[in-house]
Amino acid sequence: MAKDIRVLLYYLYTPIENAEQFAADHLAFCKSIGLKGRILVADEGINGTVSGDYETTQKYMDYVHSLPGMEELWFKIDEENEQAFKKMFVRYKKEIVHLGLEDNDFDNDINPLETTGAYLSPKEFKEALLDKDTVVLDTRNDYEYDLGHFRGAIRPDIRNFRELPQWVRDNKEKFMDKRVVVYCTGGVRCEKFSGWMVREGYKDVGQLHGGIATYGKDPEVQGELWDGKMYVFDERIAVDVNHVNPTIVGKDWFDGTPCERYVNCGNPFCNRRILTSEENEDKYLRGCSHECRVHPRNRYVSKNELTQAEVIERLAAIGESLDQAATV
């Protein structure tokens, strides 16, 4: 059965004059054609994921390709049965990718148009995965890695991408003299991060051109050597990559069983992304810790209108109580 919705993933590092006004004009156009999605605009370029029917997405691609400097922008296209977004957002930011360094400033930032790692095709990247002398580094957030990753890729001990440069500096002696290849969802983070690694003194740095999204669609590699699913920042949450021998690597936060279902912790002040089944979400009140389960603003409790007696009953079932000491 034909799928009616297309999801477009794209980015482009290119100077945008008066980027704030560009963002406002871009939002107006997107709304005028009924497009849904999330787009970041900065002086350094544009990064977005949008969705709509064939006619709407075609209008959008034609519009973007008509803009100065964006004639060759590369859209990665998925076909889906449902919209990937509920609303349309276009926001101006100082950068479309922020490295999060204390010594980083916007005037002395990495410009991928000048400094970036060598581009690797899916075939070349697969060869790198099989090369025991090559270090493969996942540059994404921890919860993205936990849902799926390339076989043998290093999972940095970080929570999010902004912590990665410091982690690399702290572990410099492990990688400095080796070939390092990096990857991310669509390529936008790696463009800048691989450039930063080059500036740090790494001599042999490569990046997966087009990211995981392109690797999974390549007719030759067909996503092989990818384990799990790819995390995406829209309503789909997870998409398939490996079309040869797919596996599940995600583990339920509470019992460690195979799982590919993400939810946010019920405590709005925590909001950690956790993998869990519906059964365990109910059992543990969607709280990643005791403190989050008993938090007075637990969203799971309020959404399901649980009484205090019901909360106490569920806590007792897992050996906890309202007044016990926090375990985090």
Swiss-Prot record:
Its EC number is 1.14.-.-. It is an enzyme of class 1 (oxidoreductase). It catalyses: uridine(34) in tRNA + AH2 + O2 = 5-hydroxyuridine(34) in tRNA + A + H2O. Residues 130-224 form the Rhodanese domain. GO terms for biological process: tRNA modification. Keywords: Oxidoreductase, tRNA processing. InterPro entries: Rhodanese-like_dom (IPR001763), Rhodanese-like_dom_sf (IPR036873), Rhodanese_C (IPR022111), TrhO (IPR020936), TRHO_N (IPR040503). Gene3D superfamilies: 3.30.70.100, Rhodanese-like domain. Catalyzes oxygen-dependent 5-hydroxyuridine (ho5U) modification at position 34 in tRNAs. Belongs to the TrhO family. This is tRNA uridine(34) hydroxylase. It comes from Streptococcus pneumoniae serotype 4 (strain ATCC BAA-334 / TIGR4). The lineage of its organism: Bacteria, Bacillati, Bacillota, Bacilli, Lactobacillales.
